[in-house]
Structures are given as structure tokens and as C-alpha cells.
From Swiss-Prot:
Protein localization: Plastid, Chloroplast
Signal sequence segment: none
Protein name: Maturase K
Keywords: Chloroplast, mRNA processing, Plastid, RNA-binding, tRNA processing
A Pfam family matched in the record: MatK_N
GO biological process: mRNA processing; RNA splicing; tRNA processing
Function: Usually encoded in the trnK tRNA gene intron. Probably assists in splicing its own and other chloroplast group II introns.
Phylogenetic classification of the source organism: Eukaryota, Viridiplantae, Streptophyta, Embryophyta, Tracheophyta
Primary localization class, coarse: plastid
Domain of life: Eukaryota
Gene Ontology cellular-component terms listed: chloroplast
Annotated gene: matK
Membership in a protein family: Belongs to the intron maturase 2 family. MatK subfamily.
Keyword Chloroplast listed: yes
GO molecular function: RNA binding
Length: 506
């Protein structure tokens, strides 16, 4: 206990003294400390259930002697042969489930969690992280309207472990620690992916994959920021030269003086280009204003970007160029586009009342109804044509549980798609859920849907959820009721129905 408290105090001091830590780049000595594995084991025991922990292989084989034996083998010159000797002795034993390997994984995760934020702090990018899903759409409504091109980017999900080692080499200058990390990562034959739901790895391995994936995405965003800054400065110089040249061509007949005298007075006319970036997991969107030639240049630049910085080839269809004013794109289960809105404005003057048209742009989030119907059909709620069917797997539940499950699903769907402009899609989804619930109860009780309507009063079922939330201020409530669109900033996870949509677009 004293050793663990001592190492925790030591780690806190290292986090406080970031400048000293930047100079001490030698991390290879940390895996040889016994306290690291004690802290990792204590942390894993708090996250896991005690009943499951007692039956686990790590709990049975974890001891101080095991840690000392592991550290002794790490000090060997050819430690890999000794480290996996027991695993290779039995062909049926999987080296990924070896207790030594799990201990090393926990220790490596702890080291990277402590030191990676400090290294990232040194080159912090300028992107702002938002926890709410709907806050991304609010940002896009404010910023994307002035952009005419977007780059729909699908970041590669699968990574080779050697790519991550090369990323570490830019931040960590400790060669032995890199060799140790390479030895651990190369033990997993499967590529590293960001989707842990389909990953065959254990909890410890998934924690390492998430940590490495976040580090990889940070490097990508950091390099994009630096590249855009360089491009912004070059674009400003180019705009300045073009303004000066136009001014020089107009005044050359009347003013006789050197060109460099004029160029120093027109810097206020230049305007830096602006880029807007949004990302959720591996799906990111770049929006900017420029010409078609500039947009193609940016697409070609990003295609070569991964090959140069991350040593991997990206398929061209993963970076799709679209003109935002004409095309729409899919993001987080919505179909997003821009539409023009014409408002007639009447100005009051002394003699007449002229009517002018004010043209504005607004973001149009649309529900992909047909794709959602396909997702509901795979879930057993309806057919591919949208006809409701009974959920046969739920007929063994009680009536209250069936009503509660349909209630929860409808609430999540309604609140997630409350910001769409086509409310008729929500009404059609409500129709599917209502009749699917009625047919499920009718199938359970072996009756007709008409009897179920009368018994459970399903005519009023789910009707209350279509009402807008009441606001505290009545005047504000009257103002917002006619807009019929709401963004809920407490939604922090994507709706399960949209996961299949993301897989289709990926």
C-alpha cells in the first residue's frame, strides 16, 4: 500500500512538472518498477466486478513473485523468447491471454495515459472538443453557411501497429521503450481498429486500442492545423500581390513612383481564408470557401497526406469532394444540405412602401427515412416496405416491459431527430412503432390489434412525446413553438439506428 501511494504521489508530481518531464524522455525504466503493475492491477480491479475478477486468470496468477519474474525476464537481452516460452510450449494456448502479457498491457496503458497527455499538451491543436452530439449541428448551422465546398473524409479505421510506433517516434525519443512497445503491439496479428464493438480483444486490449486510436487522430488533426496555417499565410500574400497589381495597373498612367511604395499600404484589404472542421470518430468534414481548383488541390493534398506522414495508402473514395450549395452529405444519421430562403421585407418611406426580397441561407437537416426503415426492418420492427410487424423476440416479456421498451426506443429516436426540418418523417416512424407495439401485444395474447387498442388505450400511446418541451418563460415559449426544431444538448451518444447508416457510408 505504501509503495502504491508513493508511486501515485510521484506520478502527480510528474504531471505538475511538465517542463521537467519534457527533458526526461527516458520511459524504458518505468516498466521495470513493481509499483506500476500494482497500480494497474488495483485500477483494473476497481473497474471489474469482484465476482468476475476472482474467476479470472489474471487474479489467480497475479502475485508479487509473478511481477518480479516478469521484470527479471524483461531485463534479459532476448526477453521475447523467454517471455513467450510458456505460450509456445502449448500450441493451444493463446499468447494474447497469457498473464504476463496482460500485466504488460496494463502497465503500458498506465504509462501512455500518464505521459501522452503531457506530450500532447506541448503541441495542443486549436480544435475545440464538444461533448454533445447536437452541438455539432449548431456549430455547422453557424459556420458552414459561408462555405461552398466540403471534403467528406473517412479516416481509415484499421491501422498497422508499425504506423503507431512511427507516430510515437516523433514524440517519444526513448528507443528501448519503442522497441518494447513494438514487441507488445506486434503480438496482435489483427490490425488496430477504432470500433471496439467488433474487436475480438479483451477489455485491457480494447483500452489500449482506444488510447492508440485517440493518439493517432490527434496527430492527424495537429498536422492538418499546421498545414492550414501555412496555406493561410501563403493565401494572404497571394491576395496582397493581386490587389497591389490591380491597383498598380490602374494608376500607372497617372502616378509615377516605385511599386513597393504602394504595396505597403494595402494590407488591410486582404482576407485570410477560413476552414471549418467537424469530426465524430472516423468521420470528419472539412468546409471552406474557394474555387474548384483549390478544392481539388486540397483533396489531392490529403490523399498524399496519409502516405507521407502515416505511411499508408488511402483509397480515393474515402475523400469525397462536394459543392455544398448543390449537394448534400450524410453526417451522424442526418442528411445535411443548404437551401435558400426568400423573405419579403417592406420598407416604410415617406412616399411609398417598397418591397424587397431578402435572400438567406440555412442548414437543412433531413431524416433519411428510407435508410431508417431498412434499419428497423433488420431489427424486426417492420418490413423493407415500412409495414409494421410484431417483434417476436419480445413476446416472452411482460406487457409493461414491452411498452417500456417501445417507449424508450421512440424517445431516443424522437429526441435525436428533433432538429430535422421534415417532421413528417417522425410521424411515419411513430406509425411504425405504434403498430409494431400493438401487433407484438396481440401476438402475445393471441388476439387482434383492435382488442389491444381497447385494452391498453394505445390510441394515446406515444402521442405525448410529440409535444415540444415547455419552456420556463412563456414569451420565449411562444417564440419557439412555431420553429418546430429543437437541439438537445444533453445527447452525448449517437442513436443506435444510425450506426448502420454510418457503416453503409463508411
Amino acid at each position: 500500500m505504501k509503495n502504491r501511494d508513493r508511486i501515485l504521489v510521484k506520478i502527480d508530481k510528474l504531471r505538475e512538472k511538465r517542463d521537467i518531464l519534457c527533458q526526461q524522455r527516458f520511459l524504458y525504466t518505468i516498466p521495470f518498477q513493481e509499483d506500476i503493475y500494482a497500480i494497474a492491477y488495483t485500477r483494473s480491479s476497481k473497474k471489474s466486478n469482484l465476482n468476475l475478477l476472482e474467476n479470472s486468470v489474471l487474479y489467480k496468477k497475479y502475485s508479487v513473485i509473478t511481477i518480479k519474474r516478469l521484470i527479471t525476464q524483461l531485463r534479459q537481452q532476448n526477453f521475447l523468447k523467454i517471455f513467450f516460452r510458456d505460450c509456445y510450449r502449448n500450441q493451444l494456448d493463446n499468447p494474447k491471454n497469457h498473464p504476463y502479457n496482460k500485466l504488460l498491457l496494463e502497465g503500458l496503458i498506465l504509462i501512455l495515459e500518464v505521459f501522452s497527455p503531457i506530450q500532447i499538451q506541448l503541441g495542443r491543436n486549436e480544435w475545440k472538443s464538444l461533448q454533445s452530439i447536437h452541438s455539432l449541428f449548431l456549430f455547422m448551422e453557424n459556420k458552414f453557411l459561408h462555405s461552398n465546398f466540403i471534403l467528406d473524409i473517412k479516416i481509415p479505421q484499421s491501422l498497422h501497429p508499425e504506423i503507431l510506433i512511427r507516430i510515437f517516434r516523433r514524440r517519444i525519443q526513448d528507443t528501448p521503450f519503442l522497441h518494447l512497445s513494438r514487441s507488445i503491439l506486434h503480438e496482435y496479428q489483427d490490425p488496430i481498429t477504432s470500433d471496439t464493438s467488433i474487436s475480438p480483444f479483451s477489455r485491457e486490449q480494447n483500452s489500449l486500442l482506444i488510447l492508440l486510436w485517440n493518439y493517432y487522430v490527434y496527430e492527424f488533426e495537429y498536422l492538418v492545423v499546421s498545414s492550414w496555417k501555412r496555406f493561410s499565410r501563403l493565401q494572404s500574400i497571394f491576395s496582397l500581390d493581386r490587389i497591389d497589381r490591380t491597383h498598380f495597373d490602374r494608376k500607372i498612367k497617372h502616378v509615377i513612383r516605385p511599386y513597393w511604395i504602394i504595396s505597403s499600404k494595402i494590407s488591410s484589404f486582404t482576407k485570410n481564408p477560413c476552414i471549418h472542421y467537424v469530426r465524430y470518430k472516423n468521420h470528419s468534414v472539412l468546409a471552406f470557401q474557394g474555387t474548384n481548383y483549390l478544392a481539388k488541390k486540397w483533396r489531392n493534398y490529403l490523399l498524399n497526406f496519409w502516405q507521407y506522414h502515416f505511411h499508408c495508402w488511402v483509397q480515393p473514395h474515402r475523400i469525397f469532394l462536394k459543392r455544398f450549395s448543390r449537394n448534400s452529405f450524410s453526417f451522424l444519421g442526418y442528411i445535411l444540405g443548404i437551401r435558400t430562403r426568400i423573405n419579403k421585407v417592406q420598407a416604410k418611406m415617406e412616399d411609398e412602401l417598397p418591397i424587397t426580397c431578402l435572400i438567406t441561407k440555412e442548414l437543412c437537416p433531413i431524416i433519411p427515412f428510407l435508410l431508417l426503415v431498412n434499419s428497423l426492418a433488420r431489427g424486426g420492427f417492420c418490413t423493407n416496405l415500412g409495414r409494421p410487424v410484431s417483434k417476436l423476440s419480445w413476446t416472452t416479456l411482460t406487457d409493461d416491459d414491452i411498452l417500456k421498451k417501445f417507449d424508450q426506443i421512440w424517445r431516443s429516436v424522437y429526441y435525436y431527430y428533433s432538429g430535422s426540418i421534415n417532421n413528417h418523417g417522425l410521424f411515419r416512424l411513430r406509425y411504425i412503432f405504434r403498430f409494431s407495439c400493438a401487433k407484438t401485444l396481440a401476438c402475445k395474447h393471441k388476439s387482434t390489434t383492435r382488442i389491444v387498442w381497447k385494452r391498453f388505450s394505445l390510441n394515446s400511446f406515444l402521442r405525448s412525446f410529440l409535444k415540444k418541451p415547455e419552456l420556463v418563460n412563456s414569451s420565449v415559449s411562444k417564440y419557439y413553438l412555431h420553429k418546430r426544431r429543437f437541439w438537445y444538448l444533453d445527447i452525448i451518444q449517437i442513436n443506435p439506428l444510425t450506426i448502420s447508416l454510418r457503416e453503409r457510408y463508411n
